[in-house]
Amino acid sequence: MNALLRFTIENFRSFAERKSLVLSHTSLDESCSSQPFLRVCALYGANSSGKSNLVNALARMRYIILNSVKVNDGEDLEYEPFLLSDKKNEPTLYELEFILSDKQYRYGFSNDSKKIVQEWLYCVNPNNSEIPLFIRDHEGIGVSEKDFPEGVDMEERTNDNRLFLSLVAQLGGSLAKKIIGFFSKSINILSGLETDDYLTFSARMIKEEKNVAALMKNFFKRVQLGFSDVTTRTQDFDAQSLPDNMPEELKKLLVSNLTGKKSVSILSVHGCYDSEGNLMENRTFPFDEMESEGTKKLFEISGPIFDTLLEGKILFVDELDAKMHPLLSRELVRLFTDESINTEGAQLIFTTHDTNLLS
């Protein structure tokens, strides 16, 4: 089982002081779930209240971790401190407490534009006592030979602007590789405002993953989107379909890059009925032309949603309710709160303005 328990940031964009998003049941009635963490967390607030920056902070932490292996010695790091106080010259801090393969860890680091200032990794016992696996500060990197042997003798091989965890993973450290994998495979971050990027992923799941496709289609029927089915059509690239008035250089570039490639079109299936309500035939229509913006968004993010549910992942969605009817947003949330559907302990964290989702 994998899960997110707490995310902490300090001195990032609009967050000057240390703030934490807590998803554990530490102060809640644990009887409300069979698992010790929240399946759903909604972040409410007015515009410019920092909701999106919290999601952006996790995205930034994830980016630094996954790209640290590519950072050259002396190369600047991503760094956006709070600019309206003397903290503008201090490091930004990121920390994540999480469950990975049923074990709990606390990993974090702080950085400015030039270097990793601090970095730490702890294993957390069931009684909440902590075992330091390694600690990095201005004096160097201290590694536990007993509890983190894969990091021994690698301390001096780490550049100032590179994460120690990343180096150990690159050199084959098993736990370090698992933690890097947790950030790359178990955490997904979506924008609810720009969902076009997820269309291909959702279409591929409909086309190739029959079990997932059945779940997605059943969900579409349950929320009564108006179509009876959704299908895909694969086509070879046809240069003749390019507009006649397209600039010749652009046309040549597209032909060069796309010849031999296939495109996937999404079609919605609608029933045609007679005056007595009897089905006469089914007709297919281009999905992006016939359906509403809310329906298109729901389909576009349905792939990541069901991938998260089936794999027990963690999904962050900024502006979940944008362009979508409140009832559709509520049904998406219910997928995660219903333990008969969310059998793998997947988590949904989202920002919203819709207080109706509180119910």
PLM feature spans:
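Electropositive, glycine-dotted interaction segments
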Residues: R106-M246
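Conserved P-loop NTP-binding catalytic core
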Residues: C41-A42, V55-Y107, D112-I116
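Short acidic, glycine-rich loop/turn motifs
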Residues: I9, L96-L100, C123, H270-E276
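Mixed-charge, low-complexity intrinsically disordered segments
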Residues: Q240-S263
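A generic "structured core" feature
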Residues: I65, V264-I266
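A short catalytic or substrate-binding loop motif that flags glycine-/basic-rich loops and adjacent residues
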Residues: M1, K87-E90, L258-K262
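Switch/communication elements of ASCE P-loop NTPase nucleotide-binding domains
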Residues: M1-L66, S275-S359
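Short acidic/polar mixed-charge low-complexity motifs
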Residues: F15, S101-Y105, K115, N128, ...
